[in-house]
């Protein structure tokens, strides 16, 4: 499985595997970058969502694996 080299490579809606479960990327916060609502995160983190609408936060983008069938 492929991994991301940078948090800038992560796209909304990307199909990823995290802790042996499949998710879609819902939100990708990048340290120091301000979003449209004025929020500036102090660390990188990615919010993932599964098919049952459960959300999970990934604090280390290197643990995300790009699902091959979606690539």
Regions found by a protein language model. Name each.
Residues 9-12, 40-44:
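A short, compositionally biased
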